[in-house]
């Protein structure tokens, strides 16, 4: 960690506790700042708040008194708190500096940064980059929106390590000096408009990722969205990824991932399924090549990386049949992606909490579905859907029973896909629990040698 002195004896107000606020407050205190934490929720019984108070950090909770701004503090804002909250709105009017916890991670570390943002795919890209580093002798520490507080991880990395940071649009607002060596924008679609108010504001938040980059840095982005992503502020060397055509960067041609005319890997050897994941893979591969990760480590990762837990996660193969856990697919859009990810015959496990909706919008994506095993409150609806399309339908009591019933109908090379298109709460406390039950049952049917 750098001995950063820019906040010594400065008044700093951390607005919003949670994990990032807690770690930011501790770091700021360590850097010599006079720290106050404010949260609109009552924190009188909160363990983290009590821990901060034991360090001499003032905690004000239950409301946002504007008197906290009277000593003109620097604001460190939790990314989840919108600028419309009274104390932040007033701080803007007073011209106070407002930073994010991610900005702190940059100020205290000399480690080069690979920063990943985008509407879709950023968690997959970040995780895949982390896995490629893990397969090499280099160190890439995951941080940010992926679940590891950036300012905490930044204190632990060496200058020779990489910080691999997933950034939401919320975290990118408030960037002042933050400068990744390699920035990735996976894509930009309409999202979070309740926070950003309009699409232009959302797009501009994403573009903050490259505003401090120089000609020595890299921006990796989707070639087919370059008009949306690029702006006059862009100074970094821009490289593209495309699954459709040759570009200055990385692309797919004749079934191979290609960089600078060199074939990296046949796409048939990739474990991570889905057309949408090809773009994620290209972005991750290009970033790791630029960071010096050996091609062998990249290939090792691509032939073993099975995705994020419960997101079209490759679970394993039993004989000739691959099993995929997509328990996080709690709506029809997510299941559309899943069903569209395979060319082989699919045995589709679906059903769950009944929220009153129908599922006819899935019909165009059911071409490769050979059979359906339905469960949960919506099993009658899914049975009706399957029968209307001439699919073989079996009813099951729950996910575990569904996996058992699969064994009676499975044929060579069938893909077994759990993609419920429904929330789990009718039978399971979380989608994670539902996914774990699927995995447990899959393992129970593996042959013992």
UniProtKB/Swiss-Prot annotation:
It comes from the Bacteria. It is an enzyme of class 6 (ligase). One of its GO terms (biological process) is cell division. GO terms for cellular component: cytoplasm. It catalyses: UDP-N-acetyl-alpha-D-muramoyl-L-alanine + D-glutamate + ATP = UDP-N-acetyl-alpha-D-muramoyl-L-alanyl-D-glutamate + ADP + phosphate + H(+). Its main location: cytoplasm. The keyword Hydrolase does not apply. SUPFAM superfamilies: MurCD N-terminal domain, MurD-like peptide ligases, catalytic domain, MurD-like peptide ligases, peptide-binding domain. It is found in: Cytoplasm. GO terms for molecular function: ATP binding; UDP-N-acetylmuramoylalanine-D-glutamate ligase activity. InterPro entries: Mur-like_cat_sf, Mur_ligase_C, Mur_ligase_C_dom_sf, Mur_ligase_cen, MurD. ATP binds at residues 118-124. NCBIfam families: murD (TIGR01087). Cell wall formation. Catalyzes the addition of glutamate to the nucleotide precursor UDP-N-acetylmuramoyl-L-alanine (UMA). Belongs to the MurCDEF family. This is UDP-N-acetylmuramoylalanine--D-glutamate ligase. It comes from Staphylococcus aureus (strain MSSA476). The gene is murD.
């Amino acid at each position: 960690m750098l001995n950063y002195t820019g906040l010594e004896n400065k008044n700093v107000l951390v607005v919003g506790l949670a994990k990032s606020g807690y770690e930011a407050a501790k770091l700021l205190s360590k850097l010599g700042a006079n720290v106050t934490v404010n949260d609109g929720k009552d924190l009188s019984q909160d363990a983290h708040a009590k821990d901060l108070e034991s360090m001499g950090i003032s905690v004000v909770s239950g409301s946002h008194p504007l008197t906290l701004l009277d000593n003109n503090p620097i604001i460190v804002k939790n990314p989840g708190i919108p600028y419309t909250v009274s104390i932040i709105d007033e701080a803007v009017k007073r011209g106070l500096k407002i930073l994010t916890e991610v900005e702190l991670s940059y100020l205290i570390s000399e480690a080069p940064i690979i920063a990943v943002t985008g509407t879709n795919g950023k968690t997959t890209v970040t995780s895949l980059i982390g896995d490629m580093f893990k397969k090499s002798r280099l160190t890439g520490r995951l941080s940010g929106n992926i679940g590891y507080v950036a300012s905490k991880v930044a204190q632990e990395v060496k200058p020779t390590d990489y910080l691999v940071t997933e950034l939401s649009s919320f975290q990118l607002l408030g960037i002042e000096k933050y400068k990744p060596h390699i920035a990735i924008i996976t894509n930009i679609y309409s999202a979070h408009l309740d926070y950003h108010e309009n699409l232009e504001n959302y797009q501009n938040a994403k573009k903050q990722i490259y505003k401090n980059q120089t000609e020595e840095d890299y921006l990796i982005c989707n070639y087919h969205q370059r008009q949306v992503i690029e702006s006059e502020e862009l100074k970094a060397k821009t490289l593209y990824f495309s699954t459709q055509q040759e570009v200055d960067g990385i692309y797919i041609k004749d079934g191979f991932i290609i960089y600078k005319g060199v074939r990296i890997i046949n796409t048939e050897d990739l474990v991570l399924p889905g057309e949408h994941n090809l773009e994620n893979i290209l972005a991750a591969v290009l970033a790791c090549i630029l960071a010096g990760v050996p091609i062998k480590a990249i290939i090792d990762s691509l032939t073993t990386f099975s995705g994020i837990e419960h997101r079209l996660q490759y679970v394993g193969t039993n004989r000739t049949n691959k099993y995929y856990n997509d328990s996080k697919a709690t709506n029809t859009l997510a299941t559309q992606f899943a069903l569209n990810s395979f060319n082989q015959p699919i045995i589709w496990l679906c059903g769950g909490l009944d929220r009153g909706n129908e599922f006819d919008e899935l019909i165009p994506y059911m071409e490769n579905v050979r059979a359906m095993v339905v469960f949960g409150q919506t099993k009658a609806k899914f049975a009706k859907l399957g029968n209307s399309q001439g699919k073989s339908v079996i009813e099951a009591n729950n996910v575990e029973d569904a996996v058992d019933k699969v064994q009676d109908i499975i044929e060579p090379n069938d893909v077994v896909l759990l993609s419920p298109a429904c929330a789990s709460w009718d039978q399971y406390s979380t989608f994670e629990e539902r996914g774990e039950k699927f995995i447990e049952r899959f393992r129970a049917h593996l042959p013992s040698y």
